[in-house]
């Protein structure tokens, strides 16, 4: 509806698995084109999009400036860009022993290239000619780690990643156990 019958929505992701999921979710729409590409080389025409969005993606791209240049290239003059990213330095679990919790979180820092991208982004966009740059904080607090909770997923991702960064399995299991006990 947002782009009308003549408009096109482009979905860009380097992961075929993600695009397969998107294809299933969007199967009822005829004007969505999914592209298996990286954000730094969409192969879209210049000035072809009225808006572009990125949701928790740019912080994982080592050279985010190249991707921002690509976004700038494909946007029509006056086009809008919306980014949703987490301030990873402020993303924390609470309840576990402070030292152990910090060890897990410190290990997790290596999971993305730009821990604090929302703080860097306004200057980067301004240098590319963007106007009316605005920030909108989206705070969220999750108090339960049930099976459908983002916290449940994040805990598993952080635990597995910590193992790849030299944190012992015993420490990871202890951390997870402490989180579970803190919730009770």
Where are these regions (language model features)?
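A short glycine-rich, Lys/Arg-flanked "PGG" loop and its adjoining helix->strand segment in the class I
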Residues: 65-80
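A short SAM/SAH-binding and catalytic strip from SAM-dependent methyltransferases
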Residues: 50-65
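Conserved catalytic/acceptor-binding region of the Class I
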Residues: 82-148, 160-165
């Amino acid at each position: 509806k947002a782009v009308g019958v003549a408009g096109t929505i482009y979905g860009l992701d380097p992961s075929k698995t993600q695009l397969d999921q998107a294809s299933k979710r969007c199967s009822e729409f005829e004007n969505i084109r999914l592209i298996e590409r990286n954000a730094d080389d969409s192969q879209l025409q210049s000035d072809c999009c009225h808006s572009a969005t990125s949701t928790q993606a740019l912080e994982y791209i080592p050279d985010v400036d190249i991707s921002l240049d690509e976004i700038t290239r494909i946007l029509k003059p006056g086009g809008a860009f919306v980014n949703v990213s987490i301030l990873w330095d402020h993303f924390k679990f609470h309840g576990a022993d402070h030292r152990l919790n910090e060890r897990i979180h410190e290990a997790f820092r290596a999971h993305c290239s730009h821990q604090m991208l929302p703080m860097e982004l306004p200057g980067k966009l301004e240098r590319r000619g963007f106007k009316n740059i605005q920030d909108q904080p989206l705070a969220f607090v999750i108090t339960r780690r049930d099976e459908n909770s983002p916290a449940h997923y994040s805990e598993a991702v952080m635990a597995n990643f910590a193992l790849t960064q030299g944190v012992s399995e015993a420490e990871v299991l202890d951390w997870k156990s402490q989180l579970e006990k803190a919730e009770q």
